[in-house]
Regions:
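Conserved polymerase palm-domain catalytic core
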Residues: 1-6, 10, 42-46, 50-54, ...
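Conserved pre-motif C helix in the palm subdomain of viral-like polymerases
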Residues: 14-43, 128-138
Length: 138
């Protein structure tokens, strides 16, 4: 299971993170290193957060390029509690369609179902994905 901790957000809200064990973090990093190059072509070209070879500066440069091309509107979407409500079966279906590797899929599913520890008590996780581990950005 991951240790659930609450981090204050600048707007006064709370961001809940799931902190994995050191061993889980190492295994997750190995998964990320293998999966990132496979998954990268499937991501939106306009997505810049937590992506290799992308940065705030590159996002701003792309924005300026759009402005120079005549675009006038920007849409900024922040879905509240998005990661807490991701349907795990749908996520795993997408993972399967991209990587088609049963062993890796099984590991990811185990992390999704590993549960959380809150105040020393363990709880099951049937929906959502933990934020705070190496797999989070992927």
């Amino acid at each position: 299971p991951v240790l659930k901790v609450e981090i204050p957000k600048p707007d006064g809200g709370i961001r809940q993170l799931g902190i994995p064990t050191v061993m889980d973090r190492m295994i997750q990093q190995a998964i990320v290193q293998v999966m990132s190059p496979i998954c990268e072509p499937h991501f939106s070209d306009t997505s810049y957060g937590f992506r290799p070879n992308r940065s705030c500066e590159k996002a701003i440069m792309k924005l300026l390029e759009y402005l120079n091309d005549g675009y006038e509107w920007i849409v900024d979407i922040d879905l509240e509690k998005f990661f807490d409500t991701v349907p795990q079966d749908r996520l795993m279906s997408l993972v399967h369609n991209i990587i088609e590797d049963g062993d890796t899929e099984s590991l990811i599913r185990k992390y999704l179902h590993s549960g959380v520890i809150i105040n020393g008590q363990r709880y099951k996780t049937l929906v959502g994905t933990p934020q705070g581990g190496n797999l989070s950005p992927l």
